[in-house]
Each structure stands twice: as structure tokens, then as C-alpha cells.
Amino acid sequence: MTGFFPTEYGLYFTTVIMSIGFHYFEAVKQSLSLQWLKKEEAPQILGRLIAIGSVTSLTVYSLLWFFIEVFQASFLINFLVSGGICLGLAIFMGMYFPSFEEKSQQNKSIVLRKRYWLYYLLTFLSGARRQIFVVFAAFLMVEKFGYSVSEVTLLFLVNYAFNWLFAEKIGQLIGRIGERRALTLEYTGLIFVFVAYGLVENATLAACLYVIDHMFFALAIGIKTYFQKIADPADMASSAGVSFTINHIAAVVIPAALGLVWLWSHALVFYFGAMFALLSLIASQLIPRDPMRGNETNLTSANSLGYQA
């Protein structure tokens, strides 16, 4: 469909449709993953899913390059072929998987619980940091260091390759050391990375920071597995939607606000990122050694009845 609307407003229209579908898919994927996976295997399997997604991205990038460079395929043809494949897969999935098994009946209404407050906070801060990386780190590569489209694409490919090779191992690490230690490692590393972004003057070093930055984000699996351990099984579907909404509060506000800061100081934008990482580090220390219902944070006791809230 996108290939038939090669205009500015056509791109806006098709992007909104794509965004609706993407976020619906991501919410369903998170909900089903946390419902179906056992708690002890969830970190590794979630890491494996990231690795599979990265392999798929590498494959699609390679095919697009092949069609464009070898066959000189137009944008219209590329979009038609890609859309046709996606439509075919959707029809196949609808025929062979007409419904999904629910291990527990899911709440059909929006669920907000006081005992999930730490999860909500970590999700919000994660969204803020993520937007600084997605929007401004790539922008830094182009504006300050003059990276070309092909060079930025190469960075994307390196990131996908890293996830392919190591995401499952990172999931295993989270399962072994626990969510608090894993998130502590992530946020400590991100503080240094964001500060380095603000100071870097070398293009190669900036590219290394970009890859390291992406590497640390794989540890964010720990937020999902922390929630799986403390949540009522009936809340998985509703809370997936809530978490995406909370995450995107930052996604709407941060790029606009820090875009104004960017015009004045590139470095200050990344220092804000370091501040968000520091706040995340502080918040992550409230995750108990063994999180569970009734023991959601270090501020609650394991035998508390607060999980009813």
C-alpha cells in the first residue's frame, strides 16, 4: 500500500497504519510470551526471540539490497512484494492458529494496580532512554560525524548481528544473576555510554558507543521477567497495553522537548539520557532478590497482603 502513496501525506497516512499494527502486534507478543513461558525459562526464551527477530531483519536487509542493486527494483515493487509476503503469512497464521490458548482467563478491562508501581516507573524511564538512543544517537552520527546512509545502515546490521549472536546468552545471564543485578549492569553501563556520547569527538569511537548502547538495551528483558514474577497471571494481556502506553508517554514528549535542547547543545541531550539512566539505576535497587506477588519491591514484605491491591 505504501508504494502507491509516494507523497508526504501519503507517507504520514501509511506510517500511522503501520504503527497501529506494529504496536498491536508487540502488545500481543509480550502478553502471550509472559503467559505461556515458565518463569525460570522466560529470560532465555525472550532473548532467543530477540535473536530470531535479528536474523529475520538481517535476511530482509540482504534481500532488499539484492533486489535494489541487482534487479533495480523500485520502491513500489519492494513494498508490494514485502506486503504480499506479510499478508500471506497473516492468512496462514489465521488459518492454522485461529485462536490462542489462555492458561488463565485474562482481564478484559484496563488494569492499574498500586503494587505494580515500580514496573510502571521502570517502563517509563526505559521509554525515555530509548527515545534518546533511537532519535538522537543516530542523528549524532549523521549531523556531527557525517555518516552516510550506507554507514548508518551498517551500524544497524552490526547491532542485529550482535543480537543474533548474544541475545539468548544475555537472557541466560538474566536468569542466572536475577533482574536486579542485570538491570544494575545495564543502567550503570548506559550512564557511562550517555556521558561518553556527550564528550565524544571521534567518529569511530561514536560508532562503537552506538553498538555498545544497543547491546545494553538487550538487558531490558529483565523488566518483563520482573513483571512476570510479581503479576497476577490474569493481568498479562491488559498490562501489556498499559506498559506500551506508559512507555510512549516518554516517546511523545522526549523527542519534542529534547529536540529544542539539541538546537542549543548536543551534549546536554545525552546528559539528560545519563540522568534517566541514573534514575533507572536507583529505581532498580528496589527490586527484591526474589520478586514475587506480595514481594514486589524492597519496600514490601514477602508475607504482605498488598498484592490484593
Residue ranges and their predicted role:
Residues M1-T7, T188-E201, Q285:
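C-terminal ends and interior cores of transmembrane alpha-helices
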Residues T2-G3, S57-N78, A138-F139, E143, ...:
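Transmembrane alpha-helix termini and helix-breaking/packing motifs in multi-pass membrane transporters
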Residues Y9-F25, T204-A218:
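Hydrophobic core of transmembrane alpha-helices in multi-pass small-molecule transporters
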Residues V16-I52:
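Cytoplasmic helix-loop-helix junction between adjacent transmembrane helices
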Residues L46-S62, I246-I254:
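Glycine-rich segments within core transmembrane alpha-helices of 12-TM secondary carriers
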Residues L64, G83-E102, S280-P288:
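C-terminal membrane-cytosol helix-exit motif in multi-pass small-molecule transporters
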Residues I68, F166-E179, W262-L263:
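Helix-to-loop junctions at the C-terminal end of transmembrane segments
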Residues V135-V152:
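Short amphipathic helix-loop junctions that connect adjacent transmembrane helices
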